[in-house]
Structure formats: C-alpha cells, structure tokens
C-alpha cells in the first residue's frame, strides 16, 4: 500500500555459475525496505554474512513486492527480531494488532526507535507470523480481544440541531469536558 514507509519484498538471488559449480544454490529472502534498491542491498548484506556470496560475484534473479491478501481485516502479528544496541545484540518478540503486516512492521520500527533508541539499520527481522487470539502473550494486544470492549467518552461536542442555528462566531467558548 502507498501509505506505508516500509514494503515487504521477496528477493531471489544466487552466486554466479562457475566451472566448479555450474548450478549454484538459489536463495530466497523476504525482507522490508523503503524501495527495491534498498531491498537488494539488504539481500546482499545478509547473503554475504550467511552464505559468503558477494554482490560482485552474485546474480539477482527476481525481486517482487509482497502485498497483503486481506488488508481490511484486523489481525494479531508476532515479530521475532534481533537488534544491536550500545551493549550488544539482543533477541526480542513483539506483538502488534494491525490490518497489514507492513503496518505492524512500521509500528515495530517506530516503537524500537522510541523505547530502545534503535534505528532501522540495526534491526534484523528474523520471522513474522499471524498469531491467533488464544496464543497472544502481550497484554497490549490481549486487551482488544474482549467483544464487549468500551472506550471512554473523553469530551462531548454539542452540535446545533439545525443548520439555521449554526453560527460562525460564538459569544463564549464551549465547555467540552464533562
């Protein structure tokens, strides 16, 4: 969707064929980036670390953006991640409620930046999954599973009963709080 900063991409690549290895192993990775160029860059970064395949002797086979199947239904998403802080590397599990996985990932990046001061390059998403309501662990997501949930009415704005009684300028400021 156009509204999200991060998009999910599926990147497929391999090492260049050589005489020793005519058909090199193909690697597929799903990752989040702001655009295709950054997705490719992230793919080669991880492939260099995991499988010793560099971009200079590698080949990009395909790159496609992955879209949400049902972007209008609310789901619980679990995100397993690894991040680098000032003290070292940490593993973490986070839960979010959103309509799309991209929205949940965006929430995760925002929360990690605010709570832990960890920016986008220092975060590695290991795994994501749609979590059923009974398997949710975090209280922040469980609180919305109640079908009889009520939200407080913080303030009430009194509107005129007809357009004829609507005025541009009021004699006194309305009191909105109860």
Curated annotation (Swiss-Prot):
In the UniProt record, the gene name given for this protein reads RPL18AB
* Family per record: Belongs to the eukaryotic ribosomal protein eL20 family.
Key words, A-Z: Ribonucleoprotein, Ribosomal protein
**NAD as UniProt keyword:** no
One GO MF term: mRNA binding
Name of the protein in question: Large ribosomal subunit protein eL20y
Which GO biological process annotations does it have?
A: embryo development ending in seed dormancy; pollen tube growth; translation
What is a single cellular component term in the Gene Ontology annotation?
A: cytosolic large ribosomal subunit
| One protein family per Pfam | Ribosomal_L18A
| Domain of life of the organism encoding this protein | Eukaryota
Q: Does the keyword Zinc apply?
A: no
